[in-house]
Amino acid sequence: MRKLLVIAALLALVAVSVTAGIWYNKLVKNPTQEYAYAKGVDAAAYSFPYFLNSVLLNKWSKPPVEGMAFTPSAAVNQFWHLSEMPSAEDYRDGGGPNLDTLYSVAFIYVGEEPIVMSVPPVPDERYYTFEIAGFDSDNFAYIGKRTHGNLGGNYAIVPPGWGGVLPADVQQLAEAPTPWIIVVGRTLIDPNNPDDLQAVNALQAQYRITHLPDWGIDNPPLPPHPPLDGLGALLDPYLADGAPKLIRKVALQDPMLFWQVVNWALDGNGVPARDQSRLPDWATLELGPGQDLSTLDDDTREGLSQSVMQGIRILQSYSDSSLNPGRRINGWRYPAVHMGRSGVSGHYLNRSAMQSMK
């Protein structure tokens, strides 16, 4: 009897082994490719803001183009101002413009020295705001009527750990979490009053960005920044495309370009201390600061290529999925309480899908 039980157990073990082998062969055809795909989907969802902001930085750094009056240009270390009211068709780089404010936007480099943002006195009845975000899209500072009043002022954004002394007429606003930051300003306008346009344009002309070493001199030069040639070499072929169209093209036609751009952004902006634990896994795929995608084998490259589309699909479907902590009440969507600083709160899908993609 014991022999029969032993034989039965051995036969069962063989059957399980054979079944497991068949199951494994069907599901895992190429472990290297599968690993790159699985890790890549997560990395794509995490790093999407770095990709999108690189696209915008490259596009917005270019000189003005005729017929593109509603697309920011020459907006590095100086403000580009929307000088007239747009329509939904006029802006093609994602999101939807307000219809009662005019925008003032800039990418600013704060990697070595502080910069000073200057805001003039603003009439009491006029709302204005400047949202300031790191390259990962998380807001870290704000200037506006509700927090700073309407008297105007000079506000310094400094590199991390900067220990210098500011002039008496400059107040420190915040430390920049990344060397490259984004400023989006809005100034209230009455769309039904044609005369109000001139008043808002006059205010916009007084919004200034100054390199601290040049503070106090007349007609200071633009603050310096690292060259963007490497980024342009990657993205200039797509300059004619709005950001949503560019994302589709890259995902479908050249997904490894996504990772090249992400690596460029991470080289220049790093990964926050709270997320450093991701880097060892990424390094096995040549993703992250200082990594070299050209050394990848074909299987890893194929897995990473496939992961880009899936990562973007997850972000596109996130808004209406159970993953979204926001709520719908009476037809209105209420965003998650950490909206605007989702990455700081550890909600990376929300950061990518709602803060960046939407």
Give the role of each language-model region.
Residues 1-21:
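N-terminal Sec-pathway targeting helices
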Residues 20-358:
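A compositional/structural signature for long, glycine/proline-rich flexible linkers
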